[in-house]
Curated annotation (Swiss-Prot):
Result of altering residue 83 to L: Disrupts high-potential heme
Lumenal topological intervals: 29-45, 103-119, 177-193
Membrane topology qualifier: Multi-pass membrane protein
Gene3D superfamilies in alphabetical order: 1.20.120.1770
Catalytic activity: Fe(3+)(out) + L-ascorbate(in) = monodehydro-L-ascorbate radical(in) + Fe(2+)(out) + H(+)
Entry protein name: Transmembrane ascorbate ferrireductase 1
UniProt binding sites for heme b 1: 50, 117
Cofactor: heme b
Documented EC number(s): 7.2.1.3
Compositional bias segments (type: Low complexity): 224-239
Species name: Arabidopsis thaliana (Mouse-ear cress)
């Protein structure tokens, strides 16, 4: 059941938080951590791609995909296409971000998949990919019957929100893990970089909260030109 809040009323805050989070992670990675690179003698530059791609590419674009489906006053076929494409881009960038972490670890001779953050991350990206593939087949092409779509919709929405919330929580865990490593290496616990990392995590969590709120809010009224098949309410869709 939708919360009695119009989705348009909360999307502005979500978009603003997304911009702030993106700027903060870029400032951290470029100004404090030295920049971004796929090939570099300084392997830390390779790792810097990981938080940038996972936050901007995976968390923010994934959130914008959810928001777009709930807040855009467009016909449902158009919203479905935008929703699908944004999630595909988010998934691709998320995979690229994980590859950057593996590349950094391999070239720095650091073990892979030893932390809770990495375990949850692999689980999240796997569930996200599974959700996208089955959603493409059922809701987009070739598409299931109206009864099949209606029956799977609650599970589609519930799994989508679960995966997204898990992704946001794991992002916060990743910031904490990296900050702990840096502090163990001598970073000032009360320095500007430590505060920047912590506040980036907080903004990320707030963005995720507003995305979930948008997904639970009422959608704009559908256009009267939408066909009967598309009049089925897919507005609670999360992925």
């Amino acid at each position: 059941m939708a919360v009695r809040i119009n989705a348009m009323a909360v999307t502005f805050v979500a978009h603003a938080l997304a911009v702030i989070a993106a700027i903060m992670v870029l400032v951290w990675s470029i100004s404090y951590r030295g920049g971004l690179a796929w090939e570099a003698t300084n392997k830390n530059l390779i790792f810097n791609l990981h938080p940038v791609l996972m936050l901007i590419g995976f968390i923010i674009l994934g959130g914008e995909a959810i928001i777009s489906y709930k807040s855009l006053p467009l016909e449902k076929p158009v919203k479905k296409l935008i929703h699908l494409i944004l999630h595909a881009i988010a998934l691709a960038l998320g995979i690229f971000g994980i590859c950057a972490a593996f590349k950094n670890h391999n070239e720095s001779h650091i073990p892979n998949l030893y932390s809770l953050h990495s375990w949850i991350g692999i689980g999240v990206i796997s569930l996200y990919g599974f959700q996208w593939v089955y959603s493409f087949i059922v809701f987009f092409f070739p598409g299931g019957s109206t009864n099949l779509k209606s029956g799977l919709l609650p599970w589609h929405a519930m799994l989508g929100l679960f995966v997204y919330i898990l992704a946001v929580g794991n992002a916060a865990l990743g910031f904490l893990e990296k900050l702990t490593f840096l502090e163990n290496g001598g970073l000032d616990k009360y320095g500007s970089e430590a505060f920047l990392i912590n506040f980036t995590a907080i903004i990320t969590i707030l963005f995720g909260a507003f995305v979930v709120l948008t997904a639970s809010a009422e959608s704009p009224s559908p256009s009267p030109s939408v066909s009967n098949d598309d009049s089925v309410d897919f507005s609670y869709s999360a992925i």
